[in-house]
């Protein structure tokens, strides 16, 4: 790009589960402006979740225009657009009209559970894990796509005739931004569909046959950092902007944290927790209940990671606030937790919806252990925060065993990282330093970095690493005997919650 030195900004489109955002970054990776719009959630039946793809497009395209207008930025000052998105959510549309044939089926939606059960009965569970790196679960796109083709009248015939297209949200947005000229996805999003062979890096013929999905529906799969096409944008003067970066939200956060080498890991502390550890160019098969997924290498090329999800993180603090009403605000939890020197032997296991990685026990249920008359609300609040750190260690221990890599440091992002007590206890229970960055918008930043590298806005990974400023490092302050004693108590508590809901209570 001949005029790249005249460009001042990169825009990240961050399409999430509840809102669409656009964030403008300057050359120093500072946020210049941002816009956000929420959209409707639809729950047609228990366990079903849908979005309107046209509303996603409307909110995302308007935030792009708003963010540029907010800072009086003209399109010719923007080097590129990067896209990061909620993963697995599935859209099917008519290639001629551009209209979706059904609402988007969201990653949380469980409607394809019966399809997954049939895949297991057919003995495909091991094949799916070996080939795609995933577990056989409705979470992923493949069975959602099959459900749409099976349940929308005429969809199967239209798909076989080449009239329908499939995409995750990144693909849908790029199709709309390029006015139907470009039908692509990146390797990180493709690896979440349960249709993609992460070793050959191509759509898997056997999975397509099993689920009866025509290959003609599927997008071209490209690297996470390259120019895919030009976005037509509205606003003053209109214009075109190159779309030059794509990554699923968790992989984008991993790249935004500059975790691009084996053993580097990040944890996003949100409602739940998402942990990813980079494993370099090696797809590590997990024997400890983790997913093997594609991540971004140093220049946006294919790398691999292990991924584990904790179901209840920040949601556990919300439970203290909303149901038990022992705090008025989530931020208060740090104050009360530090009023006592320890949890007084109390362990809270927040298995409200079962346990995620590495246990994968849907029948576990939440419990509090170690209650005595000496236990106060402050102890329970402290035990609740500690449970987030313990669950994180569960996943990281599994990652280190699978990868044969020692965790160098844990990089953190998400809302709960503002809690200094939690971050310090996390370092203590891991025996590893925890690094909290100045820039908290790591997901959007990752998408911006990928786009900026592709178009020459940033020249190298070293340049990006120089911008990754750590606001605070939490060093372990707990000696090993105490650390292991505390963690042994947690493991004992978790074991007592396993298999609790046997259907007889």
Curated annotation (Swiss-Prot):
Gene3D superfamilies: 3.30.420.40. The keyword Nucleotide-binding applies. CDD domains: FGGY_EcGK_like. One of its GO terms (biological process) is glycerol-3-phosphate metabolic process. Pfam families: FGGY_C, FGGY_N. Sn-glycerol 3-phosphate binds at residues 17, 87-88, 139, 249. It is an enzyme of class 2 (transferase). Keywords: ATP-binding, Glycerol metabolism, Kinase, Nucleotide-binding, Transferase. The keyword Nucleotide-binding applies. Belongs to the FGGY kinase family. HAMAP family: Glycerol_kin (MF_00186). This is Glycerol kinase 2. It comes from Pseudomonas aeruginosa (strain ATCC 15692 / DSM 22644 / CIP 104116 / JCM 14847 / LMG 12228 / 1C / PRS 101 / PAO1).
């Amino acid at each position: 790009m001949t005029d790249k030195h005249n460009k001042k900004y990169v825009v990240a489109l961050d399409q999430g589960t509840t809102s669409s955002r656009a964030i403008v970054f300057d050359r120093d990776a500072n946020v210049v402006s941002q816009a956000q719009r929420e959209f409707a959630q639809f729950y047609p039946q228990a366990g079903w979740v849908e979005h309107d793809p046209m509303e996603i497009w409307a909110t995302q395209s308007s935030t792009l225009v708003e963010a540029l207008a907010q800072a009086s930025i003209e399109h010719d000052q923007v080097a590129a657009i990067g896209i990061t998105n909620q993963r697995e959510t599935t859209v099917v549309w008519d290639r001629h009209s551009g209209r979706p044939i059904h609402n988007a089926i969201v990653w949380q939606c469980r409607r394809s559970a019966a399809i997954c059960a049939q895949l297991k009965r057919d003995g495909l569970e091991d094949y799916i894990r070996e080939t795609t790196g995933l577990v056989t679960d409705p979470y992923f796109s493949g069975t959602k796509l099959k459900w749409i083709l099976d349940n929308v009248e005429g969809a199967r015939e239209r798909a076989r005739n080449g009239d329908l297209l499939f995409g995750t949200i990144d693909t849908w947005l790029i199709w709309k931004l390029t006015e139907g000229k470009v039908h692509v996805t990146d390797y990180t999003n493709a690896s979440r569909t349960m249709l993609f062979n992460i070793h050959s890096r191509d759509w898997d013929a056997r999975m397509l046959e099993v689920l009866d999905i025509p290959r003609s529906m599927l997008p071209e799969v490209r690297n996470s950092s390259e120019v895919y096409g030009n976005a037509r944008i509205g606003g003053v003067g209109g214009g075109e902007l190159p779309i030059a970066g794509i990554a699923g939200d968790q992989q984008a956060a991993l790249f935004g944290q500059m975790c691009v080498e084996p053993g580097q890991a990040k944890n996003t502390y949100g409602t739940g927790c998402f942990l990813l550890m980079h494993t370099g160019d090696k797809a590590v098969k997990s024997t400890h209940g983790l997913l093997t997924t594609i991540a971004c290498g140093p220049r946006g090329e294919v790398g691999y990671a292990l991924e584990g999800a904790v179901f209840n993180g920040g949601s556990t603090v919300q439970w203290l606030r909303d149901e038990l009403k022992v705090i008025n605000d989530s931020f208060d939890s740090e104050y009360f937790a530090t009023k006592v020197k320890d949890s007084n032997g109390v362990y809270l296991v927040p298995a409200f919806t079962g346990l995620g990685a590495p246990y994968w026990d849907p029948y576990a249920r939440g419990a509090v252990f170690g209650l005595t008359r000496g236990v106060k609300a402050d102890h329970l609040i402290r035990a609740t925060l500690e449970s987030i750190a313990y669950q994180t260690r569960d996943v990281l221990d599994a990652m280190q065993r699978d990868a044969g890599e020692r965790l160098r440091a844990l990089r953190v992002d998400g809302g709960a990282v503002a809690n200094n007590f939690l971050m310090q206890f996390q370092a203590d229970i891991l025996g590893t330093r925890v690094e909290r960055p100045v820039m908290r918008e790591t997901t959007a930043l990752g998408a911006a970095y990928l786009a900026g590298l592709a178009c020459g806005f940033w020249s190298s990974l070293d340049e990006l690493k120089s911008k990754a400023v750590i606001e605070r490092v939490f060093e372990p302050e707990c000696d090993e005997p105490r650390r292991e004693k505390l963690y042994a108590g947690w493991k004992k508590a978790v074991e007592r919650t396993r298999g609790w809901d046997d259907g007889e209570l």
